[in-house]
Design a protein with these regions (language model features):
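Extracytoplasmic cell-surface/polysaccharide-interacting catalytic and binding patches
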Residues: 1-191
Length: 191
């Protein structure tokens, strides 16, 4: 494996940008592209989208896995948070919905995916640990994606387990994070 030296300046931007309540988004300069013709309203960073398409094609996912949420503006994240408090309560919302400028969705590097079925839950879509979803989970690191929020890391990430939420960090970072069973916060410290 090729070694790459990163300094602090390079760690906290680009594909390794860490966005959470302790590291709020400051700027939002990203090149977005629609996920697909069918899902024009869901946008991602161009490279992340390309890698996601390749990953799904590699397992012949077709329409079995569908995108639920890509990039969100500050206003969209604020509305989602506020609406969730009204509909689901504060405790639930704090577990599953990030505050505005604390959401990775504002970077264009995060995607929520779901098993394609009727009545998909927008906040907690079904993405089980079997079948085509598990196949995606296994190959995702080869294409630069990590499963971002795991149950055993919630004390670090401050977000409950979200098996549907994938974050593009690029390769080889995705492989290292997965192989060492780290969350992004731990990986940034590791670097």
């Amino acid at each position: 494996m090729k070694k790459v030296k990163l300094n602090d300046e390079n760690i906290h931007k680009g594909y390794l940008i860490l966005i959470n309540p302790d590291n709020l988004l400051k700027t939002n300069e990203i090149k977005l592209i629609s996920y697909s013709e069918k899902y024009k309203n869901i946008e991602l960073d161009q490279v992340a989208n390309s890698q996601l398409q390749k990953a799904l094609k590699s397992i012949n996912a077709n329409d079995e896995i569908v995108p639920i949420s890509g990039v969100r503006t500050f206003e969209e994240q604020k509305r989602l948070y506020t609406d969730s408090i009204i509909e689901n309560g504060e405790e639930y919302t704090k577990k599953f919905v990030a505050l505005p400028n604390a959401s990775e969705h504002q970077t264009g590097l995060a995607i929520d995916l779901a098993l394609n079925k009727p009545n998909i839950d927008f906040i907690c879509p079904s993405f089980p640990y079997n079948g085509i979803c598990q196949e995606f989970r296994k190959i995702a690191p080869n294409f630069g994606f990590i499963e971002r929020y795991k149950d055993e890391k919630k004390n670090i990430t401050k977000i409950a387990k979200e098996e549907w939420h994938f974050r593009f960090v690029g390769y080889p970072h995705s492989k290292i994070i997965t192989n060492k069973d780290l969350c992004l916060e731990e990986y940034i410290e590791y670097l």
